[in-house]
Amino acid sequence: RVHIRASRATGKPLIIHTRAAAEDTLRIMREEGAGTDAGGVGGVMHCFTESLEVAQAAIEMGFYISFSGIVTFKSAKELQAVALALPLERMLIETDSPYLAPMPHRGKTNEPSFVCHVAQYLASLKGIPVEQVARQTTDNFFSLFKLQQLWAERADA
């Protein structure tokens, strides 16, 4: 709750990692007004592994859903279905280094450069070019942190 209140006070987005506590997490987010729908600043559901319903509830509150290397695992069929169903405009990609290395590096120490495997997997899953995933998730990052002007200046350079 303090984390949410600090986010509201500073105008900085929340980074939320919930594991086996989705109902409690969403309830607290609602009670504390974490979402943009309640005057909060929104944020990101980091290293997301929950259901489509949880993802949709978070998106309705103005959150992005971030996928790590877990989405590339053969055993992650439910998570892959979530990723397929979500709009790319509300997705982020991450590595969660040094853990959860994506295929083909599973079981090894993860590193930031492996984020390309997450992007490639999501592109293949959605049937779109990897460049589209890279471009949209980069735009989403700059939007989340309210850095669109910086992104525009970089693009113009």
Residue locations for each model-derived region?
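Crotonase-superfamily enoyl-CoA hydratase/isomerase domain that binds
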Residues: 103-105, 119-120
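Mid-to-C-terminal alpha-helical segments outside catalytic/metal-binding sites
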Residues: 113-157
